[in-house]
Amino acid sequence: MTYSASDLARSAGARFRQALADEHPLQVVGTINANHALLAKRAGYRAIYLSGGGVAAGSLGLPDLGISNLDDVLTDIRRITDVCDTPLLVDVDTGFGASAFNVARTTKSLIKFGAAAMHIEDQVGAKRCGHRPNKEIVTQGEMVDRIRAAVDARTDENFVIMARTDALAVEGLDKAIERAVACAEAGADAIFPEAMTDLAMYRKFVDAVKVPVLANITEFGATPLFTTEELDGAGVSMVLLPLSAFRAMNKAAENVYAAIRQDGTQKNVVDTMQTRAELYESIGYHDFEQKLDALFAQGKGK
């Protein structure tokens, strides 16, 4: 979607909220870098996503175990928001620090760097991927404090603060819903129940929390690959596909590297590649080149 000047005058958070109002459920697709953000925008997505696991694996080559820090995430946010105006939802793990001050700093920094929304979770600092076993969570009270700290710190009232709970795997469905309700009452704008295993679970969250609910439909995890239509029927407001393009990109790279190593040439895999013309179109290369040509022409005319 292309935004008008009046649209861009509104904050990223306001544009995210508008997308949420306009599209039900709102598809939010993962964009591992600025180039992928532009591709997602070109494909028509109204909201995009930066995964914490994606930052760890894609930018740092590390596992999603709480190793990356706020600066790592801000670097990738800035690169995306510098070139793409599609509103960006960001994974901030547990808030990048043990205190409310850390959560506040994270919230303010995301707004400064152009993010539209964030989700913060209730795992302990030494966190794990939400679809892995042996997760540990903080108390409900500590999670509520994280939400309150984020809400109190935001400098844009439209910036969306989402509470993610991993409690299903640790305490069961009823306790997970209880946490979600408490987070919504503390000011969370939306709820992200992680690793749900059936549609009825989403419906129970929707009925209980009275704020938008996000479904994380990640591949190779605990949650079946429900369709957008199925999730709409369960009352879900947002459908997140966090790493689909990243996984496809990685597999494509593996295939290209293996083919060139084996064949001694890229000829056999060229037809699987994005062309130079397609890349130039997606990043607006010719617009930049025309401006450069105009500058050179002005210089020669003096």
UniProtKB/Swiss-Prot annotation:
InterPro entries assigned to the protein according to its UniProt record, in alphabetical order: ICL/PEPM, Isocitrate_lyase_ph_CS, PrpB, Pyrv/PenolPyrv_kinase-like_dom, Pyrv_kinase-like_dom_sf
* UniProt binding sites for substrate: 51-53, 129-130, 164, 194, 216-218, 247, 276
Q: What is its EC number?
A: 4.1.3.30
Q: Which GO terms describe its molecular function?
A: magnesium ion binding; methylisocitrate lyase activity
Instruction: Identify the pathway.
Output: Organic acid metabolism; propanoate degradation
Q: Coiled-coil region(s) at which residues? A: none
Q: What induces it?
A: By propionate.
Q: Name one GO biological process term.
A: propionate catabolic process, 2-methylcitrate cycle
- Could you tell me what this protein is called? 2-methylisocitrate lyase
Q: What is the lineage of its organism?
A: Bacteria, Pseudomonadati, Pseudomonadota, Betaproteobacteria, Burkholderiales
Gene field: prpB
